[in-house]
Every structure is written in C-alpha cells, then in structure tokens.
Amino acid sequence: MFVMFIVAEVDDEVCVKREVERAAGEVGVHVSLTPFQRREKAEKNLYVVTILGKDRVGIVRDITRAFLDFGINIERTSLTAREELISIEFLVDLGQRDAAEVRKRLRREAERLGLDIVMQPYSTFNREKRLIVFDMDSTLVEAEIIDELAKEAGVGDEVSKLTERAMRGEIGFKEALEERVRLLKGLPVEVLERIYSRIKLTEGAKELVRSLKEAGYKVAVVSGGFSYFTDRLKEELGLDYAFGNELEIENGRLTGRIKGRIIDASEKARIVEEIARKEGISPENVVAVGDGANDRLMIERAGLGIAFNAKEVLKDVADGSISKENLVGLASVLKLPAEFRKKV
C-alpha cells in the first residue's frame, strides 16, 4: 500500500478539487482533500549577546553550552579578534523567556568563565547610536579622584570609606559627597593640578573616544566628581560635553563646599536627557557607561546601559557588564565600522 501526503497552496479550491479527483480516478487511486489552516510561526524574541574576553581555547564551546543549558536557540554567530581580545556576537531567540532573568543567568556564567557580556534587544542593536555618556571616576580615568584629594588633605581613610559606601548605595550620594568635600576644607587649589597630572586614563579610553568621534558620535562625560577634572578631560579628549560638581574656592583654597546644584543620580539622568534633547537624539540612541550606584538612573534610561568594572547594584540593571581590561570592547558592542575598530 502506498500513501502520499501533499500540502499545496491553491487559488480556486473547488476547481482544483474537481480536477484532482478526475485525475485520481483515471489512474485508479483514492484521493482525499482536506482544507489545511497554516499555523503562523511564533514571533521570535531576538537578542544580540556579545561576549568579550581574552582569547583562549574553548570560549565558543563554553558559551554555546550555556545557551543550550538555558534552552536558548542560537540563530547565528560571528567572531572578531583584536590582538588578545576576542568578541563573539550571538543572535539568539529567547522565545517566552524573561530577558532580565536570562541576562542575569548569562552574566553569572560569563563571570564564572572570566568573560564580559552585553545583551541587548535586536531592535535596539540595529538602531544607530548617536550619543555616548561616560562617568569619569573609575570609568574614563582609573582613579577615584576624591580619594586622591583626600590623601593630599590627610583624610584618606575617612573619605575612602564614605566613597565605598556611596558606590554600594548604602548612603545617599549627596550626603556622602557633602561630607567628603567638607573634609577637604583648606586644601590648596594647586593640589588639583598636581592630581590631574598624575591620574591615568583607563586603558583604551583615548583611542575609543577618538574612534567614537570619527564615527560621528557625540561624546560626553557626566560625573558626580568635580568640574575641574571633567573640564580638563573635555579638553584633553576632545569631548563634546562635560559636567561635574564645582568645588568652591576662596583665596586659593577649597572651602569645603560645593557651588550650585549637586550632580547625583537623578541629576545625571536629567543632564543626559537634556543633552539628547539638545542634539535631537532619542533615548534609544543613547549609550551610558558607568560604574556606581550614582550611574543607575542614566544607565536604566539609556538605549544601551553598560556597567563598567561595576558593583553588583549596577550590573543588575545594566544591559551588559564590561571589566576594566575590556573598555575597548565597546567598539565591537557598538558595531563601529571596521575602519574605526582597527584604531582602538
């Protein structure tokens, strides 16, 4: 006995049914025609997951195994390398899975493997980014500048403890900042220049900013630190915008007070929105990069939020987490054209 199933799309159901039955009768076979309602494919829930880290044997295997364990389908994969740094881009379908939970699980697995991870919706990934905003301390520069000022003032331990508590979100930023600045009262203004001359840019920061500028980005630093240093960074790196808290100075010494409005988390987010509005850039086209609790709101509201060498409180709300060694990996995450990525 021979049985054949055929699925066909027809324009005139009645005419086709009559002709098929006639032809079947001529060759002596039985035919049964049943209307078939095509089931629409489930809409895909696509995300782009970018893995960054030092190249080693087994990275692709380890990550694909993690996707398999989580039941996530990989649509496609691409890989680029720059010296020791490798960037692997996965297009994945999350299906009905919760993106925040998947991101958290993948981040933990990536950290276990010594890798960085950024996960963003495919729709966001495909959207051209036009503004990138960096925090300053421990992001564009390696130091926490207020701690360096405190050492010069002989109050290093006290200020460092307050800084750590503020970074973890244990005390309010304004409260912590005002208390730390109060401890700097009487510090000569010449110390600020001395500190700026010795702080180091984060590895790759200068090259990354240059490539971002050449690729057409507006680049800003918005910091809860001090405007003396953000203004100097703007000049050195050719940034478009720089915002920081202004230290009050009288007779060549710090008064222990801040002039004007304090830039805390909500003020940072407001400034980012103001820059975007001024430049005619939508929030979805904004990238925010920071390391502490004070960066939380601007990272949550940006189209792409990156926790850089950050505390857990920030990693949990960011789209991705990048370690200190991989700042240049942002060029891959942002899909800068190849000619610009080569310069980073």
Swiss-Prot record:
One of its GO terms (molecular function) is L-phosphoserine phosphatase activity. Residues 48-120 form the ACT domain. Mg(2+) binds at D135, D137, D291. Gene3D superfamilies: HAD superfamily/HAD-like (3.40.50.1000). SUPFAM superfamilies: ACT-like (SSF55021), HAD-like (SSF56784). It comes from Archaeoglobus fulgidus (strain ATCC 49558 / DSM 4304 / JCM 9628 / NBRC 100126 / VC-16). This is Phosphoserine phosphatase. Keywords: Amino-acid biosynthesis, Hydrolase, Magnesium, Metal-binding, Serine biosynthesis. The active site is at D135 (nucleophile), D137 (proton donor). Its cofactor is Mg(2+). Binds 1 Mg(2+) ion per subunit. PROSITE patterns: ACT (PS51671). Substrate binds at E144, R180, S223, G224, K268. The keyword Hydrolase applies. It is an enzyme of class 3 (hydrolase). The keyword Chaperone does not apply. One of its GO terms (cellular component) is cytoplasm. InterPro entries: ACT-like_dom_sf, ACT_dom, HAD-like_SerB, HAD-like_sf, HAD_sf, PSP. One of its GO terms (biological process) is L-serine biosynthetic process. It catalyses: O-phospho-L-serine + H2O = L-serine + phosphate; O-phospho-D-serine + H2O = D-serine + phosphate. Belongs to the HAD-like hydrolase superfamily. SerB family. Pathway: Amino-acid biosynthesis; L-serine biosynthesis; L-serine from 3-phospho-D-glycerate: step 3/3. Its EC number is 3.1.3.3.
